[in-house]
Amino acid sequence: MNSQVEKYDYVIIGSGSAGSVLAARLSENAGVKVLLLEAGKPDTSPFVRIPLGVGKLLNDDRYVWRAETLPQKNLYDNKIYWPSGKMLGGSSSVNGMLAVRGHPKRFDEWREANCPGWGFDDVLPAFMRLETYKEGNPAFRGKSGPVTIVKSRPNPLSAAFVSACGQTGIPLVDDYNDLVAEGASQMQMNLHDGRRCNTSFAYLKPARRRHNLKIVTGVFARRILFEGMRAVGVEYIAPDGVTKSAGASAEVLLCAGATRSPQLLELSGIGDATRLRELGVPIVHHNPHVGEHLQDHVMPRLNYECVEPYTVNDLLRSRLRMGRELLRYFFSHQGLFATTGIAGTAFVRTRAGLAYPDARLQVGLTSGTARLATSIKTGIDDFSGFHIGGYFLYPESRGSIHAISKDPRQSPSIQPNYLSHPVDQEVTVRLMKMLRKIAEQPAMSTLIKRATRPPLGADGDEELLDYARKTSSTCWHPIATCRMGAEVDSVVDSRMRVYGVSGLRVADASIMPFQVSSNTNIPTIMLGERAAEFVKQDIARY
């Protein structure tokens, strides 16, 4: 590399749920120099720390990558909005803050799927290391980690939802992140004193004064640089538009997320050779699995009008109520502003004979015609409304994400193929019937004035599936586009090293071979912890 290029031991691309962890953990060693590159801004907007403020961020291209899918054949050709975090903390700065590890047996299945070292016993220490959770069994829950996790305070709707689940026969559970990952409960959330606890706050804030850690924001990684088959640095576009390079004497660590990591691998010459030639990218290593195997959760929501003003809709309909809740939040860090609108959940089996739950259900404190609406004008219902929704935890539908331009600032092609597999359709219908049954229970029905979408009576299999196709949207849990496994059908090995080259790892949700259970943020933070383990072990080895 050019002698004038700034040199580091490690260059990390992306400061999201895993990249921030890596930057903090690697810079614990004062003898190494770490550079963290982030395309977005610092996470200084007040809407980041105020949980309910997330609605202001998800449509703002200063804080998210605004993208959408290709038309979805099985969703009546709808294009689904697909934002991801673009600031320090990445998507942990704009997600629902729901803290879910995943079912222990699914990690054991990772280990069996050519991912040695990834069983639940292997990953449990990393889960415990990342968290502080004051409740729960100390044999399974961390008590002194950077990410503060709390159980959400019950509100009338979440309490009713959990009780109604029990009335249908769903067990109630104190801690779904323990070995018994099944049943209904209040949500666990990554909150610190009523404020969002993203990875920037949890990991970068304590580390950023270290002399050996440099954090650069507003830069777009253009490609990974190679000498032969070894990654030696990163070329990036600086805020002034000038192309610069940073050298990595030890490793480049790609943490750009399930959408951007496969795109950047392709722009760096790692991917399907035919596709790379069409892009005009020199081939470094042919691997047709880059960008393939995409999996995501997709959720239909049943909307209801509430008999009492318990919902976020009510805040948007009344300045007085909005002001009252804001004052409550600023003085106590409690109330609706201390949530992202989701408080109660249930992990359930939609049919007999399953070894573990196959669906997650939830109650949300909003209703409307547009999921990310932030006002009555943009689609929030002009009445006290809420939804109950759910999704198949282990979708069989598979899609892809691929670069369509050599410009890293342009969104890639996103094709999740939602509900393309008949099993996904069958489970979706079954869980929607479960939601209807929950709404009919005494604990829940006393709070319901009417069903708004779909109306009561539209409960046949075809009607429910039709509604799901018309209204479902992403849960923002994409994975597997740089999946971990055997070299014959994967992108990285069980230590996250990219096949076919050296000096390059991927550490983010893109490496997950298949879905664990539900939300991906906490498992991705765990991936960051494990990646740091592997890198440190390799330092010690050599």
Language-model region placement:
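Conserved redox-cofactor binding core of oxidoreductases
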Residues: 106, 111-231, 235-237, 301-326, ...
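Glycine-rich loop(s) and the adjacent beta-strand/alpha-helix scaffold that form part
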Residues: 29-33, 40-44, 50, 224, ...
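FAD-dependent oxidoreductase catalytic-site/capping-region signature
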Residues: 3-8, 124, 130-180, 185-187, ...
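Short loop/edge segments at beta-strand edges and connector loops
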Residues: 217-219, 285-287, 486
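N-terminal glycine-rich phosphate/pyrophosphate-binding loop and immediately adjacent elements
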Residues: 2-128, 287, 297-299, 303-306
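Classical protein tyrosine phosphatase
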Residues: 20-54, 119-122, 260-286, 425-430, ...
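Residue-level detector of alpha-helix initiation sites
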Residues: 12, 16-17, 21, 156, ...
